[in-house]
Each structure stands twice: as structure tokens, then as C-alpha cells.
Amino acid sequence: MTKIHACSGWCALVLMAGMNVAHGKPLAMVGPWEIHSVDPASNGVFFTRMQVAETLVEVDSQGNLQPGLASQWSSSGDGLQWRFTLRPGARFHDGSEVSAEQVAFALQQAWRKPGVMTSAPIASIEAHEGALLVTLTGPFAPLAAVLAHPSTQILAKGAYDAKGEVTQVIGSGPYRITRLQQPQRVETERFDGWQGPQPAISQVSYLTVGRAESRTLMAESGQADIAWGLDPVSIRRLQQAPRVSIVSVTLPRTIQLKLNGADPLLKDPAVRRALSLAIDRRGMAAALLRDPEMAATQLFPPTLGEWHQPGLTPLAYDVKAAQAALAAAGWLLGADGVLHKGEERFALTLRTFPDRPELPLLATALQAQWKAVGVDLKVAVGNSSEIPAGHQDGSLQLGLYARNYALVPDPLVTLLGDLAPAGADWGVMNWQSPAMEQTLARLGKETLPAGEAAALRRDIATTLQQELPLLPIAWYRQSAAVSRELKGFELDPQERSYRLDKLTWSAQ
């Protein structure tokens, strides 16, 4: 077996457990995100961020794989069998042991559902001599990264019903759930059975608050110690507030427009390029995000170092070129100010949602910019679930959302799903490239020399820039309003954890 990764420093953390634990007031957080499910397949990231549940593999701030519930892992020489050794002594919040049998059961439930695990050629998942064995039908280099995805979090047997469906979240993290009121509120408390250093803050609550203005007021008044999901106006206001600080970090996330490649109006790459030319990305980033550097000139942001391509011709704003390209495609401006081709009007509907407050604002700006070239764009602001639903039933024309390309530490895994020939809920729709499919498969199956792998990633980025099955709009900077009484707050650039166990009150 070829060793890939081993635990470092965990024993030192265990020795520190229970030392210097200070008791203070509960921590109150507010954000726009609803707790719509307890199933890791659809809402796992919420419970890993709250540090209730763990995955086998963890990730540091730079995106490097680290031990989680697995203290080490290794693969066979042919890459077909992976062995994960579990962290000794780990226990779930109900007191049961984190055994190899339960880890295998939890991953088997995740494997049988649509999700990131289906991107790996898994033949079997089983417990063997106290370890987890994953057998593959073919080599798959990023398997450990797949097992860092929140949907693969490990829950206790008591979290599942007789059909294998998750009914409650019984994890193994430093915090355990004491109260859950879906879709709005969760309360947690410090888990005394946690092996690492005991968190200084013993109780944490999260409340869903839909309006950004309300979250801002709660942060200003001290009703919330941390407020997430701030719009640019709120950020500017809170920068003047005496009670709070604004903390920001650039994320491997892109605000993008998903296009239905089978729609008669959108199937022509020349038309998609024309629509891209009609988008003033820098203007929107400056006016709406108050951050012109976040204008997306390609799909992959600079934070995705290996995938971002500085040599790509950047996506530009050129209304005249857009008009010329649309005319060349047969679209002529009618008396109503809308493009026509015969009896057909160039009318589209864009779906988005307010969970991230900037999305409706950007959608409205797109509406105005495309109107200037004769596109009649209707904006429908609804629930985030309407975009995947529209993908599944084929009714979606355009969807505006933010996509995190590092939920799996290796972006390749996300791209294998998002760019699959069948498409994906948050990826392409009715668009495919056989050449790209082969390139992605090579990157997944083979351990390639660095230069060759870089060339393949460049080919993928170039194809996406030319074909534009997804229109990049803006890169993403996450901000939070944080009480000045809190010490040790850091935003996770990988968006995996709120790092609540690192926080203390200034009086402590």
C-alpha cells in the first residue's frame, strides 16, 4: 500500500483537551440560509460548518487535505483499493463509538443517493479489521478529496430510520445539537466527549433571518454576535458601527449564469458569446458589490490557483460587438425594442433567489443591460430549489447563483459532476463536449506529470471560455459582521467551518 497521508499533531490536541476552558455567554449567529433538511445529501454543509458533524478527511485554509475522522489513509499500487484508519476513541454525540462498521454504513447511504460520491468509480465500501476499505472499479486519484465533501459526513446509527434516511443529526464534532426548529433555528452546546481542546464558548445558536436589513440591525444592536450574508450597503453601514467589525475573505466561488443549451434562443455559441459581451461585469461589481476587482473575467477565480488561467483572453464588455453578433445570428431589432427572428421574440426568464442578497440585484442589472441589446429578460426571484427543479424538468432557461468550486477540496471532483454530459443541477444544462469529457476523465484516473495536468486544465478553461455554457458574472468575497467582544474569529476560505471552537469572549 502506498501511504498518502497520516495524522499529525492530534495527540497534542488531545493532551490540551479540557485545559483553559472558559465559560461565557451563548454565541448568537444570524444568516439568510434556511435549514431545509437534515439529510447530508442536501444540507450537509450547514452541519459541518456548525461543527456538529465530521467527515473522514478535513481541509486546511489552503485547501490541503488533513486528517478528520480518519487519522490516515493509503491506496494500493494499482489505485483500486483505499484504506482509511479511524481516529482512535472517537465517539458520537449519543455516546456510541465511531466504528468502522458505522462509518461504512453512513457512506453507503451517501453513495446510494445522487451526489458527489457517484463521481468516483466505487465498487464497494466495507469495514475490515477496524478500518474502512473502499474498492474502486478503476483508479480515481481524488477519492480522499471526495470523502471531505460535507455530504459524506459520518453520523451515528441513531441518526437513521429503518429505510436508511436521516431523521436527526448525531455527529461527532465539538458541538452537539440541543434544539432544532426547521427551517429557522438550531441550538448547540459543547460536546464533552470531544477529543480535542474543549471550545471556550459552550452554547451557540443560529437563526435564519431573511432580510439583510434585519440582520444588519441585529448586529448593530448586539442581538447577533455574528451576522452572515451581508449585502454591500449593509457592509458600508456596519463599517461605521461601534459594536462590530467586518471580516472578509475571497472565496473559490463564482456567481454564474446557467444557460439551457437546448433552448432555441441559447443553443448557438455565438449568441451566448453575444450575451456575454452585453454584460458590464466591472460596472456591476463596482456599483452593486462595491468591489470592482470581483468582476469575473473567466469562470475560475484567482483563488483556484491551478485552475485560474491568467493567459485566457478575458471576457469583455462591448455592446456594439454584441449587437453585431446578434444581427449576424439573424436577430433583428423590432419596433417594440426587442430582437426578433421571424415570429420569434428574444424573450427569456431568469430564475434566482434571495439567500445571497446580491443575486436579485445582479439579476436586475442584467435585465437592464440586456434590454440595451434587445433582449426581453424577465427576472423571477423565488426559492433556491427552483433552479435544480427547472433543470430536472427542462423548464429552466437561465439560473443565476453562486457556485463554490471547493466544497470538494479538489475542484476536479465538482467539475466532473457540473460538466458531465447529462448536466447537473448547479452545472451545465443540455451542453456537452466529448473532448472535455475525455480530458476530465484523464485528470481523474491518472496521476499525471504536473506540466501535463496543467495543460489539460488549461484546455478545459479555454473550452468553457469559448463555448460559455455557463456565463461567469462575478467572483466572490464573503463578509461577516462580528461583535468586537469576540476574539479569534477567522473566516474559512474553503467555507467548510465557522471555526466556533476557536472563539473566546474578550472578557475571558
Annotated model-derived regions:
Residues 30-77, 85, 108, 170-171:
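N-terminal lobe/hinge region of extracytoplasmic solute-binding protein
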Residues 148-199, 203, 211-213, 308, ...:
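Gly/Pro-rich hinge or "lid" segments in bacterial periplasmic/extracellular proteins
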Residues 190, 267-368:
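Append "and occasionally in soluble cytosolic enzymes with long acidic Gly/Pro-rich linkers
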Residues 181, 278-309, 323, 358-367, ...:
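Detector for C-terminal structural segments
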Residues 71-114, 133, 265-267:
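Aromatic- and charge-enriched surface segment that lines or borders ligand/interaction sites
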Residues 31-49, 69-70, 96, 141-152, ...:
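A structural "hinge/loop" feature
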Residues 191-237, 364-367, 376-378, 384:
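Ligand-site clamp/hinge motif
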Residues 85, 116-158:
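Surface-exposed binding/hinge segments that line
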